[in-house]
């Protein structure tokens, strides 16, 4: 079976979830892009009280407004975004979802989904997940000279 990866990124308005920007690229293991998607969550992005707490609040007008004007990003209801995500997973036979800190992204998506729909499951079936951050750390440790990785790990233990 061909390995097809959906590399995901979310931006949240706060630590409890409230995803306001969800984007992904679907590609093969060699990086050949099959499709991409990026949307602002209308239920969150249009709420000033929520959005002022966002890490990137200063970029709302300098970053997102021009993207909306240039049709580089769309604003959609959460359910429509999730429906598109699910449809793309099926259409492109996605085998793995990857993100830099996938635990955060999946938790934020789950919290947002539950808050906006009352449902607890974002994805409809089990799928492999890859934490790019963890993968990079493990790859770096494997590249160290034999024995050095253990020494460095022991130096940092407390």
Pin down the residues of each PLM region.
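Active-site-proximal helix-loop-helix substrate-binding element of RNase H-like nuclease domains
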Residues: 43-68, 132-158
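Short helix-capping and hinge/turn segments at secondary-structure transitions, especially at repeat
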Residues: 87-90, 114, 118, 141
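Acidic, Mg2+-coordinating catalytic module of metal-dependent nucleases/exonucleases
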Residues: 93-103, 107-113, 147-158
């Amino acid at each position: 079976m061909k390995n097809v990866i959906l590399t995901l990124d979310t931006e949240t308005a706060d630590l409890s979830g409230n995803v306001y920007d969800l984007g992904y690229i679907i590609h093969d293991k060699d990086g050949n892009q099959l499709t991409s998607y990026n949307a602002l969550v209308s239920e969150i992005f249009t709420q000033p009280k929520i959005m002022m707490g966002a890490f990137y609040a200063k970029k709302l007008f300098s970053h997102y407004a021009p993207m909306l004007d240039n049709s580089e990003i769309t604003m959609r209801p959460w359910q429509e975004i999730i429906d598109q995500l699910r449809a793309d997973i099926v259409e492109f036979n996605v085998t793995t979802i990857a993100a830099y800190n996938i635990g955060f992204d999946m938790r934020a998506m789950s919290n947002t989904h539950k808050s906006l729909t009352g449902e607890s499951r974002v994805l409809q079936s089990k799928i492999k997940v890859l934490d790019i951050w963890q993968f990079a750390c493990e790859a770096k440790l494997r590249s160290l000279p034999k024995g050095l990785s253990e020494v460095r790990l022991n130096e940092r233990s407390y």
